[in-house]
Amino acid sequence: MSSSSDYSKILQTAYNQFLLPLGGKKVPTPYRRNEIGNFQKLGPEFQGKSSPNVIQKAAKQLAKEQNFYFEKASIEEIREFLRKNKLGIDCSGFSYRMLNFLSQKVTGKSLEGHGFPHVGRTNVNKLTSDEFSVKISIFEDCQPGDIIKFDSASPDGIPHAAIILDNQNGVVSYAHSSKQTKPEGVHTGEIANGKLPEDLLIFSFNIDKGDGIRRLKILA
């Protein structure tokens, strides 16, 4: 099994793929969640679960059709173009893609190869379920690849997740995709000495209601 530092490097590589190379720029993938009830009405690249390569390919094709020039646009203008065209990734899609990349590098098998459902049929509750993960009770024991679960008791029943990238000297770095935060979409942040940053304070975090740190069994 690889070391924690290896996990961190692998996850950073996975994250960098979500900084889409468009027009000579690195464009952070925006947030995209398919509307409830429309899952089968859109192509897979528009459902908020696609790989960075698929999103990039679709973006280039749509830009060609719409005469949009990435080279002349700012990063935010490109991100707005992606949003308008329903291209991006939601929090569970991002988490799945990050962990799938890690699994392939560490175990030689994809998440599906380990029995996980397809990315389009997986959500945060499934990733953090007792079937596929174990609870990490002490925050300081978290490692790269662990999942931080928030909003387990949210009224809409949809929790949020962030993936831990590293844990060094009391500073835990993480990555997630969110619509509610600033910046929106895929981005990173840090938790210093166990104190949640403003980026994460918009989400509830209540251990008694199911929130906390989870580690995939295949990485435990």
Regions found by a protein language model. Give the residues of each.
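N-terminal capping segments
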Residues: 1-105
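Intrinsically disordered, low-complexity segments enriched in small/polar residues
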Residues: 35, 41, 46, 111-113, ...
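Alpha-helix initiation/capping motif
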Residues: 51, 107, 123, 188-190
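...with weaker cross-activation on analogous glycine-rich loops/strands in unrelated enzymes
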Residues: 106-182
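Low-complexity, Gly/Ser/Thr/Pro-rich intrinsically disordered linker/tail segments
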Residues: 177, 186-220
